[in-house]
């Protein structure tokens, strides 16, 4: 959720690619980054990304970070937020995952650091990787399983919740998640 009460989301096809329910489904809409404003109007913020996944705004909402999951290895792209906060432009790589690295859902703290769910079943990568506002790795929280998503919670937004393959973990951190994220 953005401060203007718009909801931004991606619609990747991951859950429908297989034959899990007895048939292979097809996407209803292209895999874009979408914006739903408070009046209910849905628009495409950008179509310039292949299989977008996790996304989060910078603390000042001038940038949007988005995982581009079709690339191998995956890349967290960064876009400038333009047109009075309604569109995205100037896509560029922000974090290139090393081979085998799989960034997924992530959140941003008040200092602009990215806390990224990460991994694909190996103990050197499974957990949460933390990157500073320039994309430099500054921390790692090891988990015994792949971490798919994270969020900050608690009264002070200083508790990190980590949704992993089979478990939810949490710990208190020395920062706060951005409001709304």
Model-inferred region functions:
Residues 1-7, 14-15, 27-33, 41-63, ...:
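Beta-rich, blade/repeat-based domains predominating
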Residues 12-14, 69-71, 81, 119-121, ...:
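Short loop/turn segments immediately following the C-termini of beta-strands
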Residues 16, 42, 64, 73, ...:
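Flexible, glycine-rich phosphate/dinucleotide-binding loops
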């Amino acid at each position: 959720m953005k401060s203007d009460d718009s909801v931004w989301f991606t619609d990747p096809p991951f859950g429908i690619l297989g034959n899990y329910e007895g048939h292979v489904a097809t996407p209803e809409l292209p895999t874009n980054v979408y914006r739903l404003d408070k009046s209910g109007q849905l628009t495409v913020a950008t179509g310039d990304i292949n299989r977008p996944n996790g996304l989060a705004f910078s603390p000042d909402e001038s940038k949007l970070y988005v995982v581009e999951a079709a690339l191998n290895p995956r890349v967290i792209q960064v876009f400038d937020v333009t047109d009075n906060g309604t569109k995205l432009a100037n896509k560029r790589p922000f974090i290139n995952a090393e081979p085998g690295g799989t960034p997924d859902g992530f959140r941003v703290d008040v200092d602009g650091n990215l806390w990224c769910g990460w991994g694909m079943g190996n103990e050197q990568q499974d957990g949460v990787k933390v990157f500073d506002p320039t994309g430099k790795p500054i921390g790692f929280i090891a988990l015994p399983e792949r971490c798919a998503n994270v969020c900050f919670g608690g009264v002070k937004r200083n508790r990190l919740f980590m949704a992993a393959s089979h478990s939810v973990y949490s710990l208190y951190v020395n920062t706060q998640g951005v409001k709304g994220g």
